A protein has these predicted regions:
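N-terminal glycine-rich anion-binding loops that anchor highly charged ligand groups
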Residues: 29-33, 43-48, 200-204
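Iron-sulfur cluster-binding electron-transfer modules in prokaryotic oxidoreductases
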Residues: 14-15, 91-422
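Generic structural signal for well-ordered, non-membrane alpha-helices
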Residues: 30-33, 53, 70, 137, ...
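Residue-level recognition of specific faces of alpha-helices
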Residues: 24, 51, 71-74, 278, ...
């Protein structure tokens, strides 16, 4: 694709990056076949190729409009197009650059601005989000259906964690909304790691990974989140922690980008690369310990009936982190019978705050995904990202859990025996 960027961006780092990405696109259109919004709306401008043309026009000096902004807003950033693209177009980075420019040039209506301010004020702050969520859960039965669906039900679960007792240690990203919505998830991960001889150590000062602010075009706040985490984790990594582990693939995909996003920061560039290098999804950690894990699971699952489970692979897991088939293998080893899921590459519609900002499209995508997931009559739906988990649960009766909780449940007899001996 030939380009002629405007003076305002041509010689900037973002301009050079955007120019390189634009030139790698060959207009083939393969991306449209796997784009969820294009499949729903059938509009070229609501697919990756059309959005690339819109961004190119803006970066070449064209005046963006509210319609331009709408088409960019409708993108889920699911990155299925990147998996499909034969030319390796780094679409999500071009979208980040384009959205930031359009955000500066197009003033949003007051209602949109207030909603985004509220999201930025509450969701990245666990100390504020969790109590507000509890209040919402208390009054949830009294709310009208559409509003009630947006508030996840309170989930019972074991949130007890083992003490740090092993020489092998990892840091765990706790997240911002996950501790409030599903506190049992990280606790389950800590117990599974403990059974494998790995302790999770506390890192006070860490918080939101930065993805939420970043994708709402609050770039400065996102970078501040990232730097705070780097400062919190650096002492543990320097002292021998083996990884920064995340149980939410959306967070993990953002951690993987720390090195890239802070590459031009003289103070943090090197440390950001270290965090990205040490970033591991919990599935990757368990895969590295698969021999020991499988041996434990063989003891605890022998003779137990296999439970039918549908696995939803979040976009951030399969397209962002490029982890495919790994969780399914671990679940099978834990005694689960996986049911087939059609169109597994498509997004469920959660996409961070997308379900709040684009509720109609999000709901359609969720319902389509639930139809595919429940077609095999599973007893449970498992996933790997808190946003997907809450979003899918809001639309159906089949329980939706994080897959690590199923591993924890399968290992429970072995862990109880081990603890009784210590």
């Amino acid at each position: 694709m030939q380009t002629q960027l405007a003076d305002f961006i041509r010689d900037t780092p973002e301009g050079r990056e955007a120019d390189s990405i634009l030139r790698s696109c060959v207009h083939c259109g393969f991306c449209t076949a796997t784009c969820p919004t294009y499949q729903l709306l059938g509009d070229e401008l609501d697919g990756p190729r059309g959005r690339i043309y819109l961004i190119k026009s803006v970066l070449e000096g064209g005046a963006p409009t509210a319609k331009t902004q709408l088409h960019l807003d409708r993108c889920l950033t699911c990155r299925a197009c990147e998996t499909t693209c034969p030319s390796g177009v780094n679409y999500h980075r071009l979208l980040d650059i384009g959205r930031e420019v359009v955000e500066d040039k197009v003033r949003r209506p007051l209602g949109q601005r207030l909603l985004r301010v509220a999201l930025l004020a509450v969701m990245p702050r666990p100390a504020l989000f969790a109590p507000l969520l509890r209040i919402g859960q208390l009054v949830r039965p009294l709310l009208p259906g559409p509003l009630r669906d947006k508030i996840p039900q309170r989930r019972a679960g074991d949130d007890q964690r083992p003490a740090s007792r092993h020489p092998r240690r990892v840091v765990m990203l706790e997240g911002c909304v996950q501790p409030g919505i599903a506190p049992a998830t990280n606790a389950a991960a800590a117990r599974v790691l403990d059974a494998l001889g790995i302790s999770v150590i506390s890192t006070p000062g860490a918080g939101c990974c930065g993805a939420l602010r970043f994708h709402l075009n609050a770039q400065d706040g996102a970078l501040a989140d990232m730097k705070r985490n780097i400062d919190a984790w650096q002492p543990a990594l320097a002292a021998g922690a083996e990884a920064v582990v995340s149980t939410a693939s959306g967070c993990g995909a953002h951690l993987a980008a720390y090195g890239e996003l802070l590459a031009r920061d003289g103070e943090y560039a090197d440390r950001a690369r270290v965090v990205s290098d040490f970033n591991r999804d919990i599935a990757q950690v368990l895969a590295a310990e698969e021999t020991a894990l499988t041996a434990l699971l063989e003891k605890t699952t022998a003779g137990r009936p296999r439970r039918r489970v549908a696995f939803h692979a979040p976009c951030t897991l399969q397209h962002g982190l490029r982890i495919r088939g790994l969780v399914e293998r671990l679940l099978t080893a834990a005694g689960c019978e996986l049911t087939p899921v059609a169109d597994g590459h498509l997004c469920c519609g959660s996409a961070g705050t997308y379900s709040i900002l684009q509720p109609d499209l999000s709901r359609q995508l969720r319902d389509n995904k639930l139809g595919a997931l429940t077609a095999g009559a599973p007893a449970l739906i498992a996933t790997a990202n808190i946003g997907c988990q809450a979003h899918l649960q809001s639309g159906g009766d089949t329980p939706v859990v994080h897959w690590i909780e199923l591993i924890d449940e399968a290992l429970a007899p072995a862990m109880n025996t081990t603890r009784s001996k210590t």
